[in-house]
Amino acid sequence: MNIMRTAMLLAFMTALFMGVGYLVGGSNGMVIALLMAGGLNFFSYWNSDKIVLRMYGAREVDQHSSPVYYKIVSDLARRASLPQPKVYIIDNAQPNAFATGRNPQNAAVAASTGLLNQLSAEEVAGVMAHELAHIEHRDTLTMTLTATIAGAISMLGNFAFFMGGQRHSSENSHSTGAIGGLLALFVAPFAAMLVQMAISRTREYAADRRGAEICGNPLWLASALSKIAGGGHTVYNEEAEHNPATAHMFIINPLRGEGADSLFSTHPATANRIAALRRQAEEMKGARVENMGWNEKIGLHKKSSDFRDLNSGAQTSVFNEESTVQRIKKRPSWLRYGDSKRPRS
């Protein structure tokens, strides 16, 4: 269902792009627009990950420089049968994370220092599982293509408007051409923006569900989303504000003013996502114990003692709701860090 909807929305964006090209230069303009889209997408396919990581000043880490964070990602990737992605840290106080890369073999995940400092190991695992789900679903490529096409539509729309519909004026239909230019300038970019946001919202729900399956506990991600949403919008993310086209990449919209689950939001409402994850937790009861190999009686409300290795030593507990905690009493065997060493300074 989600794949079909995404394919239909992408097809609509491509048709919209070609339509704007037709307004600019007739049938020739439509062909040129299609070729232009292909060129832009080819460039984005090979370079988008490098561009966005450089844009946010991300630095790569490994098992020596950030052992716990790296181990979480490695263990989750292995559980999802994915290649080991590159692991990055962004020096930003806003708790957030994203994934990028053209395919699972060339993927990367990035988490902010704010996220690593404020979340427990279990919550970080939930977030990273969500990002790995995006990689598994190839959402990173899908969103790159939609962002590229949306930007190209906006560019062509401006060009069509300033052309003033010249191809129609010679036939005494200047007004029709002007109307076409206005449509290209305002309606087409607006429609492309709505489609891009719709694709983003669709994929977030799918990544939440698959991420919960990867880590084995939907409540870890639900708790992480609650904390990120609670503190994220109080911290100004300068890079994201200057590059709003990348907002859809993050697990929570990094821009100020993100509100309800509407046509104009890049992400579903956090409350709706948490509710869906809680329902999934109920569905997974029993299956978690049978399939995940739980063997430690450590409640999720306890702090992850070795998670202070990540950065500053800040630690937080997970959900405080006793009814939620009591339903999930154990931590899976793969999430143990008793032998992790502190990162080298």
UniProtKB/Swiss-Prot annotation:
GO terms for cellular component: plasma membrane. The keyword Hydrolase applies. It is an enzyme of class 3 (hydrolase). One of its GO terms (biological process) is proteolysis. Its cofactor is Zn(2+). Keywords: Cell inner membrane, Cell membrane, Hydrolase, Membrane, Metal-binding, Metalloprotease, Protease, Transmembrane, Transmembrane helix, Zinc. Disulfide bonds: none annotated. Gene3D superfamilies: Metalloproteases ('zincins'), catalytic domain. Binds 1 zinc ion per subunit. It is found in: Cell inner membrane. The chain crosses the membrane at residues 6-26, 27-47, 145-165, 179-199. It comes from the Bacteria. CDD domains: M48B_HtpX_like. Its EC number is 3.4.24.-. It is a multi-pass membrane protein. HAMAP family: Pept_M48_protease_HtpX. NCBIfam families: PRK01345.1 (NF002363), PRK03001.1 (NF002826). Belongs to the peptidase M48B family. This is Protease HtpX homolog. It comes from Bartonella henselae (strain ATCC 49882 / DSM 28221 / CCUG 30454 / Houston 1) (Rochalimaea henselae). The gene is htpX.
